[in-house]
């Protein structure tokens, strides 16, 4: 038996995340390590959509797979496009916004300790 996990994004359910300032955001968990909680997820943000402003103790690495993102980290803004990445240290308040006309698709890796 192989120890390799294959996860098909097309088979993962997306959950809408609304409230607390979030709108137009959907998340799909692709993998969560059962031992340390590290998580691999896919996010879709509709044009004009935004995630809620939040902070957590684990690092969050993000890769933009498509579209455009405006990322606010502790008040500092970054504009990212397809292929760009940003790593947000634990404890830093942040949120994402899609300023573009097409959906933003990003892949996020949440460090150990993520729920």
Show which residues each predicted segment covers.
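Short acidic-glycine-tyrosine-enriched beta hairpin
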Residues: 75-90
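Conserved short histidine dyad/triad with adjacent acidic residue
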Residues: 28, 40-56, 90
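Short beta-strand His + acidic residue motifs that chelate non-heme Fe in jelly-roll/DSBH
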Residues: 51-53, 71-72, 88, 94-101
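A short, N-terminal "cap"/entry segment at the start of jelly-roll beta-barrel domains
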Residues: 1-38
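Short, conserved beta-strand element in jelly-roll/cupin
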Residues: 44-45, 56-71
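A short hydrophobic beta-strand segment most commonly corresponding to one strand
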Residues: 87, 101-115
């Amino acid at each position: 038996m192989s120890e390799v996990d294959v996860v098909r994004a097309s088979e993962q359910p997306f959950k809408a995340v609304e409230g607390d300032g979030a709108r137009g955001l959907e998340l799909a968990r692709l993998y969560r390590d059962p031992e340390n909680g590290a998580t691999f997820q896919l996010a879709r943000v509709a044009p004009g959509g935004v995630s809620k402003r939040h902070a957590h103790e684990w690092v969050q690495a993000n890769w933009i797979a498509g579209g455009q993102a405006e990322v606010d980290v502790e008040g500092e803004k970054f504009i990212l496009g397809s292929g760009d990445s940003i790593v947000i240290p634990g404890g830093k308040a942040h949120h994402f916004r899609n300023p573009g006309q097409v959906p933003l698709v990003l892949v996020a890796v949440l460090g150990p300790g993520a729920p």
